[in-house]
Design a protein with these regions (language model features):
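Amphipathic, Lys/Arg-enriched alpha-helical "gate/interface" segment within cytosolic domains
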Residues: 1-146
Length: 146
């Protein structure tokens, strides 16, 4: 079970007891997702449905995912995102993923990148500054990860 809330700045947050997904449209066709906590699958397809709606609205999407606050993720969630990324390649211009300093998250994302067969469409960042620079290049302003 989870709650969905639209924040005053227009961001949308999906929140459960253990995890949150915050979606922020940085500009049309550019979406930032911040995931914090331990994702046990309580959101079902809701996160992917949100991203899919953005892709339909803007035709293509540059997708930034900040996973530096992730503590854990169950296999079915990882597998669902891997398959979703594989199937949605045509609508995704680029995917930037910030894993932060977690070896677990970096390894998990690296495996998912290979299994999704997306090639260099997915860029993995371990340094928050590099991630912020990638956002700035796309958006045109300086953005800082949480």
């Amino acid at each position: 079970m989870f709650e969905r809330e639209t924040l005053p700045d227009g961001a949308t947050i999906l929140r459960s007891e253990r995890c949150s997904h915050t979606f922020t449209r940085l500009r049309p066709g550019v979406l930032l997702l911040r995931i914090v906590g331990n994702d046990r699958g309580e959101f079902g397809d809701a996160p992917m449905d949100f991203v899919q709606a953005e892709m339909q609205r803007f035709r293509t999407l540059v997708f930034f995912i900040d996973m530096s606050g992730v503590e854990g993720v169950v296999s079915r969630v990882r597998e669902a995102w891997t398959e979703w990324l594989r199937l949605q390649q045509s609508g995704l211009t680029r995917v930037h993923m910030l894993t932060g300093g977690s070896r677990f998250v970096t390894t998990t994302v690296s495996v998912s990148k290979e299994l999704s067969r997306t090639g260099e469409m997915i860029q993995i960042h371990t340094d928050p500054e590099r991630f912020a620079e990638a956002i700035a290049r796309v958006v045109g302003t300086r953005a800082r990860p949480a």
